[in-house]
Amino acid sequence: MSRRVATITLNPAYDLVGYTPEIERGEVNLVKTTGLHAAGKGINVAKVLKDLGIDVTVGGFLGKENQDGFQHLFSELGIANRFQVVEGRTRINVKLTEKDGEVTDLNFSGFNVTAQDWERFSTDSLSWLGQFDMVCVSGSLPAGVDPDAFTEWMSALRTHCPCIIFDSSREALVAGLKAAPWLVKPNRRELEIWAGRKLPTLQDVIEAAHSLREQGIAHVVISLGAEGALWVNASGEWIAKPPACEVVSTVGAGDSMVGGLIYGLLMRESSEHTLRLATAVAAMAVSQSNVGVTDRTQLAAMMARVDLQPFN
């Protein structure tokens, strides 16, 4: 049976990724360039899914002035492209990794989405997204997109495709959660902001996740960084800890986890197997300079080393 996924990235970026032992503020810092990638959270998810053999369609907005890198990537990977091109330039995000694994993001501004652009996207996307088994909506809102309009679009999307996977932050996260998507993947800090309080223990995190579920969200996955991830759904609560590995870059690790979650859910795997797979895919991303699953044997070995336990 053919399984199809669409990913929506409203605010993609070219990721300029580099390494420096330590950032010294106010000084000239020498940086080793490790890559320049056409990226964005949903695009990273699409790359992982394509590597795992899933048919993927991507959509969102692209800036007219520097779209070539994205168009080339979609063609090269064989990913169906439904992006809407708007006036302006897609932004550049600089991501610097230090020797201790700390990542500093410098996210520049990009194109502005007009009211007409948004109306066209909203109408067009809702006309074709209903054909997919799952839709992944990821990332931030570009300039010009009203959070309330985004909530309305997400709510309308639910009537066309109930299985929405949502991964965002800040105002986009708050707006999207109002539409009660099927699965959400905040990190611990984002969950604290939503809850309006610190969550110092894992039990606190679990309780906040259940509060989200009470709003109609079926699956809540909380990224804990190097500590792994928690998954809370109607069947139970699990915590997965990734195997130790050399950290090359943490850029795209969260998106890789989302790709693994979607794949496991599409294949109707158990929650335990799916979380183990997603944690392994994220660990693979950390050990390389770009996202993707290039070696299924390596993935299987990584899965075997994931420590997964019921939380209670």
Where are these regions (language model features)?
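Gly/Ala-rich phosphate-binding loop of Rossmann-like dinucleotide-binding domains
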Residues: 50, 158, 266
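Hydrophobic anchor at the start of a short beta-strand
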Residues: 5, 54-56, 81, 164, ...
